[in-house]
Amino acid sequence: MRTRLTFALALAALAAIAVVAVASASGSSTPLITTATSLHVIEHPVTDTVIDTGAKGDTSGDLLTFHNKLYNAANTKVIGRDQGSCIRISPSAGSWECMWTNFVAGGHITVEGPFFDTRDSVLTITGGTGNYRNARGQMLLHATAHAQFDFKFSLIP
C-alpha cells in the first residue's frame, strides 16, 4: 500500500512539473509579429574594413567587417546599430556573402545573403530576438546616392 501511495505521489509531482513546463514554454513562444510588418532603417557605413587575406588586391576570400549606426527612415536619428561580416566571393561579379545582426529597439534581427557592389541585394531574415523572435522574411539593401544604405525589412510571422 505504501509503495502505491509513493508511486502515486511521484506521478502527481511529475504531472505538475510537466504542466508548469508546458505553460512556461507556451507563454514564452507567443509570436509578437502576427501580421506582415515593415521596418526601414538607413545604415551609415563608416566602420567598414576590408581585410586582404590572399593575393594583393580585391580577391576571393577577402573579408569585410563592420559595426555601423542605424538611423530612422528620415535619416535624422540613431535608432540602432549593426555588426557583421562578409566574405568576397567573386570580384569580377562584384559579389560578397554576408551575415549580420541589426540591433534595434525591442530586439535583434539577423540577416544572411549576397551583397552586390553595384546593384540592390535581397537578404534572408534568418531570425531575431525579443519583439522579433519569430521574424522571418527578407531585407532589401539599396545603396543611396549619399554613400549610405537603405535596409528595408519585410517581416512575416
Describe the predicted segments one by one:
Residues 1-9:
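Bacterial N-terminal signal peptides that target proteins for export
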Residues 9-19:
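Bacterial N-terminal signal peptides
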Residues 21-24:
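Sec/Tat signal peptide C-region and signal peptidase I cleavage site
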Residues 26-157:
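Beta-strand-enriched cores of mature, soluble protein domains
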